[in-house]
C-alpha cells in the first residue's frame, strides 16, 4: 500500500463491483435511506469523528455512507478477521473513507488495524465509537488502565488473541506521548454497541464504575434483537454451512447450543432446511420454549455422538469442548454463530492434524482417525463462510445505530457514563420505516380504542416492560 493511501483493502480494483452491490442493497434498506433523507439537510453528525468497528460488508457500506451523509467523518475496521467483504471495503476506500479491512486478516493485522481507527488522518482523535463486540471500546479502556500504571494484566493474557492485543497496548504506551490514552478517553463522547457480547462487556464496566463514556445498547432495541438476531440468523446460518460444506441438510441431526434470539433463529434455519434439531440450554425458560417449539432439549454430552452438525449460539466460552469433539461422528460439522471464537475450544485443537479444504473450512483429525469439519476456525460462520444477514434485516439494526449516534452526539452532557437504550418511540419508528417496502398495511387505532387501552393513537403501543 503506498504511504499516501489512508486505507488497507485486498484490491481497490474491486470498488466498482462493490459499488454495484451497494446500489442494490440501498433498495433493500429503506430505514437507512429514510433516515438519510430526513437528516441530510440538518447534518446532525457534523463534527462527529466516528471510529467504527463493525463487519465491513455491503450492508455496512450503506451504514457508513449514511453516517457520512449526515455530516460525520469516519474511519472503519471490521470487527472479525473473516467477515470483511473485500469488494465492499474497496468501494468505501475508493469513496475516500479510510477503511482497514481484509477478509482473512491475521490477529496481529486485526489489532493493528483497530489501532489505526484512533490515529486520525489530521493528527486528531475520534470523538465517537460505533462498535460491534466491544473491541474498539476495550482498546480505549485497556490502554487507559495500563497508562495509569495498572500493567500487571498485560503480562497475563488468557488467549493467543489477548497476547497480541496486550503486546499492541505495550507498544503504543512506548510510542505515544504520555497521557495519549487519557486524551483519547476524554475525547470520546459516547459509543453505540451492536451486539449481545459487546453489550455484556459494557454492563460489566458500568457495574464496576469503570465505563469511561456513555453507551447506547443498540442490541436490545426490539427492532435489532428480535429481527437481526432472530430472522437474520434464520436466513444466514444454513447459507454459511451450505457454502462451506455443500452438505445435504435434510435428514441430518443438528445440535444448537443456546436458545436465545440467535439460537432461536439458528434452530429455525436448520429445521427449515430439513434437519432434525436438538437444543441445549442452561436457562429453564429458554429450555421450555425450545421444547414447546418441538425441539429435543438435551445436553451437549448426549448430543455429541448423535448429531451431524453442531452450532454454538450462547455468547459463553467452552461450550463445545475437546472431549465433546472426541466423541463426535466422523466428519461432523462444527461451527459458531456467536460473536467470539471461544465458544468452541479451538485452541485445544491446534496440536492435531489440520487439513485446509478451502478458505475458512478445515478438517481436523484426531489420534483415533476420526475427523471434524470446522468452519471459520470457530468464528462467525454466517459471515466467514457466507455473506452474513440480508440487507433488509440489517437496515433495521443500522437505522438504530444511526439514531443512537445522533442521540449521543447531539446531546453531549445529557448522559452519565452508563448504558442506555433507545426509547420505544424510536423502536416503533424504525419498524414503521420498513413496512411499506414489504407491503404491510398498518391498522390505525380510533381515538376511543386508544383511550380504552391507555395509549396514544400514534404510539408507543406497548409499555417498556412488554416482552415481544
From Swiss-Prot:
Cofactor(s) required, per the database record: NAD(+)
Binding-site residues for NAD(+), renumbered to this chain: 195-197, 229, 258-263, 281, 316, 337-339, 382
Pathway: Amino-acid biosynthesis; L-homocysteine biosynthesis; L-homocysteine from S-adenosyl-L-homocysteine: step 1/1
Highest taxon above the source species: Bacteria
EC number(s) per entry: 3.13.2.1
Cofactor binding notes: Binds 1 NAD(+) per subunit.
Compartments (UniProt record): Cytoplasm
Transmembrane intervals: none
SUPFAM superfamilies the record matches: Formate/glycerate dehydrogenase catalytic domain-like (SSF52283), NAD(P)-binding Rossmann-fold domains (SSF51735)
Enzyme class (EC, first level): hydrolase
A Pfam cross-reference name: AdoHcyase
Swiss-Prot/TrEMBL keywords: Cytoplasm, Hydrolase, NAD, One-carbon metabolism
One GO-annotated biological process of the protein: one-carbon metabolic process
GO molecular function: adenosylhomocysteinase activity
Catalytic activity: S-adenosyl-L-homocysteine + H2O = L-homocysteine + adenosine
Family named by the database record: Belongs to the adenosylhomocysteinase family.
Function: May play a key role in the regulation of the intracellular concentration of adenosylhomocysteine.
UniProt xrefs under NCBIfam families: ahcY (TIGR00936), PRK05476.2-3 (NF004005)
Identification of the protein by name: Adenosylhomocysteinase
Gene encoding the protein: ahcY
